[in-house]
Structure formats: C-alpha cells, structure tokens
UniProtKB/Swiss-Prot annotation:
It holds the Pfam family Methyltransf_11. InterPro entries: Methyltransf_11, SAM-dependent_MTases_sf, UbiG_MeTrfase. The keyword Transcription regulation does not apply. Belongs to the methyltransferase superfamily. UbiG/COQ3 family. The keyword Chloroplast does not apply. O-methyltransferase that catalyzes the 2 O-methylation steps in the ubiquinone biosynthetic pathway. Its EC number is 2.1.1.222, 2.1.1.64. It comes from Methylococcus capsulatus (strain ATCC 33009 / NCIMB 11132 / Bath). Pathway: Cofactor biosynthesis; ubiquinone biosynthesis. This is Ubiquinone biosynthesis O-methyltransferase. GO terms for biological process: methylation. CDD domains: AdoMet_MTases (cd02440). It catalyses: a 3-demethylubiquinol + S-adenosyl-L-methionine = a ubiquinol + S-adenosyl-L-homocysteine + H(+); a 3-(all-trans-polyprenyl)benzene-1,2-diol + S-adenosyl-L-methionine = a 2-methoxy-6-(all-trans-polyprenyl)phenol + S-adenosyl-L-homocysteine + H(+).
Amino acid sequence: MATDNVHIGEIEKFGSHAHRWWDPDGELKTLHAVNPLRMQFIQAHTSLAGRKAVDVGCGGGILTEALAKAGADALGIDLSEDLLGTAEEHCRESGLTVAYRQISAEALADSQPGEFDVVTCMEMLEHVPDPASVVAACTRLAKPGGTVFFSTLNRSLKAYLLAIVGAEYLLRMIPRGTHDFASFIRPSELSRWARDGGLDLAGMEGIGYNPITGQFHLTSDIGVNYLAAFRKPAAAG
C-alpha cells in the first residue's frame, strides 16, 4: 500500500531552486558536476539503450535527461510540482522525449510493479522520513533481472565535516541547510534494506572531491557520498 512518505519542508526547500535548477553555475552546480559520474557508474553496471528507466526523485530532470540521451525510455517522478514544471520545460527546449509524473515511488510501485529495467534514486533517500520504504518501492519497480541504483551520504564524522561543514558553510558549494546529518544513511543500512527486498549488491563506489582542482571523481572511499548498484534476480525458469 502506498504511503505518504514525504517531508513537505524538503519539497518546498528544493522547489525554491526550480528557477535555477539548470544553471550549471547556480546554487545546484554540484548536481551538474557529479552527473557525469553518476552516468559513468550506471553505465558500468547496465546498458541503457532501449531500456525502460525510471528516475525516482528526479527534481528538475538532470539525470533523467541524461538517461534519455543515452537511449533509455525515461520516466522521471517527483512530488514537487515546481521542479516537474522545470523538468518538462527544459525537456521541451532540449528536444528530448521524457515523461514526467507527480507521484511517489510507493504509489508508482503499486500501479506499475516490475515494469522497469533500470531504477535510479539519486540524492533523495536522505530527504524522506522513511528511506527504507523508498528502497522497497524501487525494488518493486524493477523487473526481474533489472538494476537499481542509489546515491546518498554516509552517516560518518567525515561526511559531517566535508558534506555539511565544508560544502555548505566553508566552500558554499551547496545551499546551507541542504542536509540533515541525522538523515544520512550508512552503506550497511542501505544494503540491509536492499537485501530485505531481495536485491543483490552489484557494486558500490564513493564520490570524491579535490578542492584544489575543483573536480569530482569516483573513488573506493565510501565515507562521504557514495553510489550503489543492486540487481534484482532474474525470474526462475
């Protein structure tokens, strides 16, 4: 059964950035900077051409459009009307074919279970009251043999110092108040929720940042930001 797994304050907070979501030099420039790494990680674990993909918590559509450009039949879902409006407008300007819906992961999983080859949920789990519910919904959305991707922040001292103190207050890479440390998720927690739904871990990598060069990179260090890929076992027979 679908739940109202939503934090209205979070929706309003991110919706307030809708008008500059696609500005690569704006408040959310970090999303633009890390998106190529997200795509690199995704494409290392699955092909996208001709695949049916859903981007959960798509925001203004940065990753959703990248999935479509790589050949996926992409659907982006979010609960922010403002962000979906931004996503749809940018999609039209880009000449891409992307579908967007204002619906929760849980509700979509109730209506379209097992329909997607690829499920992505990036930088979203730490912004909902019940992240385990979203993980379960993403699992249900995936076809047998499909791949489910998450990215979030580790609940570690290093993440607090770098992602909050450093990124929000010292370097001002992202708006202050973007993150709540208590909502960060340890890799062991994410892996347990995924296992509970029957997913198998396929890979996990961190996202590192070099403050001297201003460049992001994939790394084996999952102490701060990390990406995880899980596979849903293929149907027997």
